[in-house]
């Protein structure tokens, strides 16, 4: 298995089938439009491959907040169902942990649905701990996935 950062919209859109495991209704046009807005704001993606097959993917953001300084936020960690429990998620976490350190980040953050217990176990195993709540107030649910 190899892990590498995906560069540009076309390379990211090429891996949409992995994201479709999480968002089955996401299509290429909509995904490309979202990426066009996200990429200029410190968004990136990392993917794990075995030969030409993408086994897992994660988006990430590097930003700064008053309360924590510079941080890296994981966004949509998805491992193909047929490749779970093979170390794909661990490879993604390790890569992004090193990227955060190389970029001078003080912490790594992520959001998770409260009912995603399998993911919670993995997050705990990777040293994450719940520190607060992520409250939302949906203003228009037409753009909300998941």
How should these model regions be labeled?
Residues 1, 52-57, 72:
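Glycine-rich phosphate/pyrophosphate-binding loop shared by adenosine-nucleotide-utilizing enzymes
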Residues 1-29:
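Short amphipathic alpha-helix that is part of the acyltransferase structural core
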Residues 36-47, 73:
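A short helix-loop-beta-strand connector motif used in the catalytic cores of GNAT acetyltransferases and
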Residues 47, 53-62, 78:
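Conserved beta-strand in the GNAT
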Residues 63-74, 84, 130-131:
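A conserved beta-turn-beta hairpin within the catalytic core of GNAT-like acetyltransferases
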Residues 79, 85-98, 125:
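Conserved acetyl-CoA-binding loop-helix of GNAT-fold acetyltransferases
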Residues 90, 114-132, 137:
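Conserved active-site alpha-helix within GNAT-family acetyltransferase domains
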Residues 100-112:
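Conserved GNAT acetyl-CoA-binding A-motif
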């Amino acid at each position: 298995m190899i892990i590498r950062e995906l560069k540009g919209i076309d390379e990211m859109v090429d891996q949409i089938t992995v994201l479709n495991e999480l968002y089955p209704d996401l299509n290429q046009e909509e995904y490309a439009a979202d990426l066009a807005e996200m990429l200029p704001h410190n968004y990136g993606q990392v993917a794990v491959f075995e030969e030409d097959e993408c086994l897992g993917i994660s988006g990430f953001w590097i930003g700064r907040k008053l309360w924590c300084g510079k941080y890296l936020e994981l966004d949509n960690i998805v491992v193909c169902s047929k490749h779970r429990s093979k170390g794909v998620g661990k490879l993604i976490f390790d890569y992004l942990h090193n990227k955060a350190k190389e970029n001078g980040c003080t912490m790594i953050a992520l959001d998770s649905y409260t009912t995603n217990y399998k993911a919670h176990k993995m997050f705990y195993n990777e040293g994450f701990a719940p520190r607060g709540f992520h409250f939302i107030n949906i203003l228009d649910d037409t753009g909300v996935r998941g």
